[in-house]
Amino acid sequence: MTTARIPVDELTEEQAKDELARLAQEIGRHDRLYYSEDAPEVSDAEYDALRRRNLAIEQAFPNLIRADSPSKRIGAPAVEKFEKVRHKVPMLSLDNAFTDDDVVDFVARVRRFLKMEPHAPIAMTAEPKIDGLSLSIRYENGRLVSAATRGDGQVGENVTANARAVADIPNVLSGDFPEILEVRGEVYMTHRDFLALNERQRAEGKQTYVNPRNTAAGSLRQLDASITAARPLKFFAYAWGEVSEMPSQTQMGMVEALKSYGFRTNKLMCLCETARELLEHYHAIEERRATLGYDIDGVVYKVNDLALQQRLGYVSRSPRWAIAHKFAAEKAFTILRDIDIQVGRTGALTPVARLEPVTVGGVVVTNATLHNAEEIERLGIKIGDTVQVQRAGDVIPQILGYAEDRRPADAKEFVFPSVCPCELKTPVVRDSTAGGGEGVVRRCSGEFACPFQRIEHLRLFVSRRAFDIEGLGEKQIEFFFRDPDLPVKSPADIFTLAERDAQNIKKLKDKEGWGTVSAGNLFAAIEAKRTIPLDRMIYGLGIRHVGERTAVTLARGYGSWKAFHDSALAIAGGDLSAREEMDALEDIGDAVIDAIATYFAEEHNCRLVEALAAQVNVLEAERPVADSPVAGKTIVFTGALERMSRDEAKDMAERLGAKVAGSVSSKTDLVVAGPGAGSKLKKAAELGIEVIDEDMWFQRIGA
């Protein structure tokens, strides 16, 4: 089971660390796609679920909080094509509420923090949450001098020229304005303008856009401001950054002041005094959502009194005095035209619904994942049914069910294939459960012979966590796999590309989508990865159950590629002593060993591995020191470490043969405590466990 599927309260400390690393990477990727590339791949609900899981794990394992934790980060770094601008006042994001109870809890938290009576009225504003691109505009003496996107909340992109081209953004303020004023709000596009823009695109034979939000964001972030000027962008003002003299001491008063300066503000903003009033306004806006003419994805509540906002302050990446109450995912009905089968890297067959195109929340949906045969059976759907789909952003959404009264007489039941859809038509087998029964996952038994699996294996091989070959992504792998002149059918083929290209009459640089520079850069990037750490080599093989962390464990356990390779072959041949040696490694169990044995028992895999090993230089891993003063001991680090980070401390201890735990127990041998050590220090004293400080730790290990 991957750590992503394990409930938070069932995670071990090692699993929690791996999961936090995975979440930091995944959330960071989605932040970059959303904030920097205007191309989100998941819905708000899915993204929020990732952040909630990250926060829950951090609360359960506070000692594992990473320096790059998403809970400390807002947005994504500014991209390089725009000049970077540091916000004088950070552009923070908001915590989210998803249910009415969440809103009631938010209001109660505010009252408790302010030491108010449980039912005392507290004025809060409620306004629609615009689904657009956040922008900060700076005015000095009433004149627009700069504009920047949110970026990561600290540093954004300079889009001043583009902001001047937005009709709703005044170049000169009206009325009695402060000398310095940073106005913040959302750039968006109305539904009517979006549809008209797509009509023009079609008329000119150009590609149409996906939804108003991405189109607005992409339009503002053009290097050519004339393109921005040609797009019908609008702007709602709702907040501020640096202000030389506050025109009001309330949230509502500040927004009214922004309106007097010449900005468009939202007419649906109102004042409420209780959670009930907030929820009533939320549901009223939700009912009007479809008729507003622009996209919103929730309602934002803010404490109205700015002095109270100041008292409430901030928690990590968000203010205590505000929250965004998100709408539930949007739904729509459409026709299920067909069901196709996709094959993943491990051979898993996933059914995908092909739908009659339907617009859900501004996105044209044509596909939906069905997960497995059991899900199709559970839903009871047939080809030809009218199905209800729930939007999941701009990727494959979810089917919720079907309309029984609309089922046609010729609705066709889907029969899950017994053979792989690849040209080999290899048999499909079902996974086994821990109890020996049949699992829900069906797999192609063709392994590397299956072209679909080979492509997915190649994609893993060049991925960031494996060989990390720059310029060789999913599209390029697909290209080379199908290319008749420079075919790449195995990892080893990647390292012979330049040599084969030199011998070919038709060069890569002359092919569509390539050129002299891009081809040269690719060959150089490949050459740079001929020397590779052992753990990345092992991970890049794509063995089932051998993830990034397991690959590190195997690398440290065996030290060299030859030692690991020889052991794997021996295990595949039934050598029990080799199996016992691998089983003795920390966190390596039967599932991993069986997967390695299966992999290396396949002659085709062995040939691929040998060919790859002949092309690369695999670095030896630094093996744990067996005779160090802390070898074999379980160590806990707690408190603030001054000479090393927590990760450095853990890595150092593990290299010395120790096991690092996150909590103190009777199995703990040593606690290394820095300033601020709390409950763990107390627990160590209760259990009579040795406690030393950081300086003593370095003395003990002789560093």
Curated annotation (Swiss-Prot):
GO function term, MF aspect, one: DNA ligase (NAD+) activity
Domain BRCT, chain residue ranges per copy: 625-703
Binding site for Zn(2+): C420, C422, C444, C450
CC per GO annotation: cytosol
SUPFAM superfamilies referenced in this protein's UniProt entry, alphabetically: BRCT domain, DNA ligase/mRNA capping enzyme, catalytic domain, Nucleic acid-binding proteins, RuvA domain 2-like
Binding site for NAD(+): D44, A45, E46, Y47, D48, S93, L94, E127, R150, E186, K302, K326
Needed cofactors: Mg(2+); Mn(2+)
EC number(s) per entry: 6.5.1.2
Entries under InterPro entries matching the protein: BRCT_dom, BRCT_dom_sf, DisA/LigA_HHH, DNA_ligase, DNA_ligase_AS, DNA_ligase_CS, DNAligase_adenylation, DNAligase_N
Family: Belongs to the NAD-dependent DNA ligase family. LigA subfamily.
HAMAP family noted in UniProt: DNA_ligase_A
Functional summary from the UniProt entry: DNA ligase that catalyzes the formation of phosphodiester linkages between 5'-phosphoryl and 3'-hydroxyl groups in double-stranded DNA using NAD as a coenzyme and as the energy source for the reaction. It is essential for DNA replication and repair of damaged DNA.
GO BP of this protein: DNA repair; DNA replication
Gene3D superfamilies cross-referenced by the UniProt entry: 5' to 3' exonuclease, C-terminal subdomain (1.10.150.20), 6.20.10.30, BRCT domain (3.40.50.10190), DNA ligase/mRNA capping enzyme (3.30.470.30), Helix hairpin bin (1.10.287.610), Nucleic acid-binding proteins (2.40.50.140)
UniProtKB keywords: DNA damage, DNA repair, DNA replication, Ligase, Magnesium, Manganese, Metal-binding, NAD, Zinc
Organism: Chelativorans sp. (strain BNC1)
Stated name of the protein: DNA ligase
Catalytic reaction equation(s): NAD(+) + (deoxyribonucleotide)n-3'-hydroxyl + 5'-phospho-(deoxyribonucleotide)m = (deoxyribonucleotide)n+m + AMP + beta-nicotinamide D-nucleotide
Pfam families from the UniProt entry: BRCT (PF00533), DNA_ligase_aden (PF01653), DNA_ligase_OB (PF03120), HHH_2 (PF12826)
Record keyword Zinc present: yes
Active site per database record: K129
